């Protein structure tokens, strides 16, 4: 590898919008602000919403279901 072409890989203080703070390593700089982390993301907290797509599927079948049948 060539010398002096790679960015510095430093410790970064990450702050989430929920207030959680942790430290990781990155080439971005010394501080990083993020919107979601493992403490506030719905997948990890178990508070995720399940979207009901059954109505959309039924509406599609009602509108276009007749095109698959032969007369």
Swiss-Prot record:
Keywords: Metal-binding, Ribonucleoprotein, Ribosomal protein, RNA-binding, rRNA-binding, Zinc
Pfam families noted in UniProt: Ribosomal_L31
Annotated residues for binding of Zn(2+): 16, 18, 37, 40
GO biological process terms on file: translation
Cofactor stoichiometry and binding remark: Binds 1 zinc ion per subunit.
Coiled coil: none
Cofactor requirement: Zn(2+)
GO cellular component, one term: ribonucleoprotein complex
NCBIfam families associated with the record: L31, PRK00019.1, PRK00528.1
Listed PANTHER family: 50S RIBOSOMAL PROTEIN L31, CHLOROPLASTIC (PTHR33280), LARGE RIBOSOMAL SUBUNIT PROTEIN BL31A (PTHR33280:SF6)
Complexes and interactors: Part of the 50S ribosomal subunit.
UniProt family annotation: Belongs to the bacterial ribosomal protein bL31 family. Type A subfamily.
Summary of the function given for this chain in its UniProt record: Binds the 23S rRNA.
Protein name: Large ribosomal subunit protein bL31
Organism: Pseudomonas putida (strain W619)
